[in-house]
From Swiss-Prot:
It is found in: Cytoplasm. Monomer. The lineage of its organism: Bacteria, Pseudomonadati, Verrucomicrobiota, Verrucomicrobiia, Verrucomicrobiales. PROSITE patterns: UMUC. Mg(2+) binds at D10, D104. This is DNA polymerase IV. It comes from Akkermansia muciniphila (strain ATCC BAA-835 / DSM 22959 / JCM 33894 / BCRC 81048 / CCUG 64013 / CIP 107961 / Muc). Binds 2 magnesium ions per subunit. Residues 6-186 form the UmuC domain. SUPFAM superfamilies: DNA/RNA polymerases, Lesion bypass DNA polymerase (Y-family), little finger domain.
Length: 359
């Protein structure tokens, strides 16, 4: 059976780069897309801003402390969506097997491509060149035989990078990866893995599937496969994502009071940042909890206004927590997500975002 040829394309500082492209006075300067207000969140940061530690999803006030001369520019989501459509038109010159992950990121299956180009790396090179020439933006691309490795490859030489992970080099490459680089390993999961003496791909590969499933649930089986370079997920052009969410599994169970006062505010802030980055608009909030015995419960509420900021999300999340009949039980997992997208978003699959396996 022939190996698949998968490309992951990730635009470089997409929103911020568009602002620098359209506003010459911003070029070479640290800029952030967002509002410089007490309640503001950075939706995107230029590479100049990132050198000061400014990151997307960061509160604007914190960003200004890190970089006092940071320039804020308003979010122009209509422009970002239009540019995203232009980028996708370039992708479709080569294949219709395009799976959008967000406005600025997509997988392409070029195993059978329209021009009949034999090498995927040549297609990636052409796509990058056409994006630069036609849109005056840069993209990073990763090439490999599955989605997991293609995504890692696109991050490897950012910005404006191109990197290939060949099947013959995959095992050695994965073995040296820090555990944080694995898709699905966020801060909390990385801490739990380090507590189990798993800090890189080689140590992850040394663990059997039962061990990983016991400690990480269903995701443990995914980690087991990733450590072996196995990822059979197809590129799905019709995939429609209808929510934005984040969740965290805790190394030590948290009390109800800790959840209300400490954990939910952090999740609400993270969710607000993801909503800002994605441009997703929805008005249904879902709270997900998992108890130490792995019993899971959810509560949701739909409100008239669109949920975009921590200040709107957190009170509603706390209300849902109060309504949850949990008694004095502790929690091993908490999660928040916004769904029920507006009709205008259902018209374009690249206008939606779901960050999978983040924790």
């Amino acid at each position: 059976m022939n190996q698949r040829k998968i490309i992951h394309v990730d635009m470089d500082a997409f929103y911020a780069s568009i602002e620098q492209r359209d506003h010459p006075e911003y070029r070479g300067k640290p800029i952030a897309v967002g509002r410089p207000e007490m309640r503001g969140v950075v939706a995107a940061a230029s590479y100049e801003a990132r050198r000061f530690g400014v990151r997307s999803a960061m509160p604007s006030m914190k960003a200004l402390k890190l970089c006092p001369h940071l320039i804020f520019t308003r979010n122009r989501m209509d422009v970002y969506k239009a540019v995203s459509a232009q980028i996708h038109a370039i992708f479709h010159r080569y294949t219709d097997l395009v799976e959008p992950l967000s406005l600025d990121e997509a997988f392409l299956d070029v195993t059978e491509n329209k021009p009949g180009i034999p090498l995927a790396v040549d297609i990636a090179r052409r796509i990058k060149k056409e994006i630069r020439r036609e849109l005056h933006l840069t993209a990073s691309a990763g090439v490999s035989y599955n989605k997991f490795l293609a995504k890692i490859a696109s991050d490897y030489r950012k910005p404006d990078g191109l990197f290939t992970i060949h099947p013959s080099r995959a095992e050695k490459f994965i073995a040296a990866l820090p555990i944080e680089a694995f898709w699905g390993v966020g801060h909390a999961t990385a801490e739990r893995m380090r507590a189990l003496s798993i800090t890189n791909g080689a140590q992850l590969r040394a663990r059997d599937k039962d061990f990983l499933v016991r400690h990480f649930g269903k995701t443990g089986a995914i980690f087991y496969n990733f450590a072996r370079g196995v990822d059979d997920r197809p590129v799905e052009p019709s995939r429609m994502r209808k929510s934005v969410g984040c969740e965290e599994t805790y190394r030590e169970n948290v009390t109800r009071a800790e959840a209300l006062e400490q954990r939910l505010p952090l999740l609400a802030e993270e969710l607000a940042g993801r909503l800002a980055r994605s441009g997703f608009r929805g008005n249904t909030l879902t709270l997900k909890v998992k108890f130490p015995d792995f019993v899971q419960k959810t509560r949701c509420a739909t409100v008239p206004e669109i949920l975009t900021e921590k200040e709107g999300i957190l009170p509603l999340a706390r209300t849902l927590m109060e309504e949850l009949d949990s008694g004095d039980r502790t929690f091993r997992l908490l999660g928040l997500s916004v769904s029920h997208p507006q009709e205008e978003q259902r018209q374009g699959i690249w206008e939606q975002l779901w960050l999978e396996l983040e924790y």
